[in-house]
Amino acid sequence: MRVTLVVLLALFLALQYRLWFGKNSLPDYWRLQQEVSNQKNTNENLERRNQLIYADIEDLREGEDALEERARNELGMVKKDEVFFRLVPDRNP
């Protein structure tokens, strides 16, 4: 009986060691759960960003107003016989 108890205790301790310190232990599992959570957050942020970009692309494909606005703001284009004034803020207030 005593030998069986010692063997069972040794087996229990060996399993506990593997559970806490071995390969694929609980701390590894918790770390991987955190990494998965972080990756899900990153994916959600990128998905929102992609949706905004797709909406912008669709707006540019369908509407002339968005295309004209982008040409004016980003490229500085103006219509024929139009004068465009851009006010630049003073760097030293």
Swiss-Prot record:
Residues 22-93 are periplasmic. The keyword Cell cycle applies. GO terms for biological process: FtsZ-dependent cytokinesis. The chain crosses the membrane at residues 4-21. Keywords: Cell cycle, Cell division, Cell inner membrane, Cell membrane, Coiled coil, Membrane, Transmembrane, Transmembrane helix. Residues 1-3 are cytoplasmic. Essential cell division protein. May link together the upstream cell division proteins, which are predominantly cytoplasmic, with the downstream cell division proteins, which are predominantly periplasmic. This is Cell division protein FtsB. The gene is ftsB.
